Amino acid sequence: MSARRQCGYRLIAVLGLACLSLSATAGVEHESLPPDYPDSLERELAALQAKIATQGVRLDRLIAGAELYLDIADDLFEEDTQKRLAYEAAAEMARRALLMEERNAQAHFLYAAARGSAERLKGIANAGLVLGEIKEHVRRAIELDPGHAQALQMMGGLYAELPWLLGGSEKEAESYLRRAIAADGRYTNAHLILARLLIKQGRSGEARAHLDAVLQVEHPHYPYAWKRRFRPEAERLLKALLSS
């Protein structure tokens, strides 16, 4: 395998890990889930589309649409083609939001999350270019809103997963993740990413504290992802630490 192709695979792997670490926390905040969630997402999207058709396009509606498409891709669809199309729709709505207001931090973050998730499903083509574009939008989101917990988490995840030659830095990763947690600790995936980094560094005691934070959180953001992904992962990592 050529060095260029190896680099491409590494980049798309990093892209995938980064997007998997955030995409379940990039959409609409369903603090209290409808009984038929995630099927209810299609109903929400239809209502939003009807409002846009009858009342016109507005910034908040584009943001809401991007968030809904991300949730549909993450939580409802199972087939990769459907997921990719939903991610692309989310990216397009976020792009249109940025055309209306470039200084919208959430739109930059949503574009990065959706674009990265869509490209992850396509393969290695243009992986380096896409990764650079994603980092640019995440940086801009943080520049506009230094307390944007999700963007801070995503940047921390990128620094944690990228190799040193491609700009990775465990020190920067830890800094961004701690900033994300300080901004809003109920985004529990930031605790998970930081815990994995601390385990890698042999800092088991600190890692356990963050895993406990995932398990003991009250009213986590995105309870669907927390219940199905974040809590089980924290339990698995904590069990492995305690048995080692």
Task: Tell me the role of every PLM-derived stretch.
Residues 200, 208-244:
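Terminal, low-structured helical/coil segments at or just beyond the last alpha-helical repeat
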Residues 66, 71-80, 117-126, 158-167, ...:
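Short coil/turn linking the two alpha-helices of tandem helical-hairpin repeats
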Residues 116-117, 129-131, 140, 144-179:
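Alpha-helical adaptor scaffolds
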Residues 23-77:
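N-terminal leader/linker segments that initiate helical-solenoid repeat arrays
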Residues 50-53, 92, 98-99, 139-143, ...:
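Conserved structural position within tetratricopeptide repeats
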Residues 41, 78-92, 125-137, 165-179, ...:
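Structural signature of tandem alpha-helical TPR/SEL1-like repeats
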